[in-house]
Amino acid sequence: MSKEVFIGIDIGTSGVKILVVEKNGNIIANHTEPLGIIIKKPGWAEQKPDDWWKATKKGLIFIVNSLKPKNYEFLSIGLSGQMHSLVGLNIKDKPVYNAILWNDGRTHEECKFIKEQTGSMLGEITGNPPLEGFTAPKMLWL
């Protein structure tokens, strides 16, 4: 009889983390494929979106090879990752630039512009001021 398990994949800043877990929370396997950060200028932080996909595939292959897949029934896959990172796509859904990460600080001037244009309204509506790590200032920068 096969064990029912779940796969969790977290595409994080430092790496793609993959976990296989049983219903009771027992961890069957885990693996991390490291990712690098591209720093072109002080305060900038980028990654190549294709590297996320390559690391995910490599990690899943590692996990499957470390298990005997016929002994497991994979019930679902959960995904998370790259909150507030921006990936601009062309008309063919291909990245036009590296992903600008959540911890990138290049959008200081764009944040000032948003604050000037919205005053306190943005913070009152969203509960957040415009911050360099958020997506809207990055879109203005592009």
Q: Would you name each region that the model predicts?
A:
Residues 1-97, 124:
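N-terminal glycine/serine-rich phosphate-binding loop of ATP-dependent small-molecule kinases
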Residues 57, 87-141:
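Glycine-rich phosphate-binding loop and adjoining helix at the ATP-binding site
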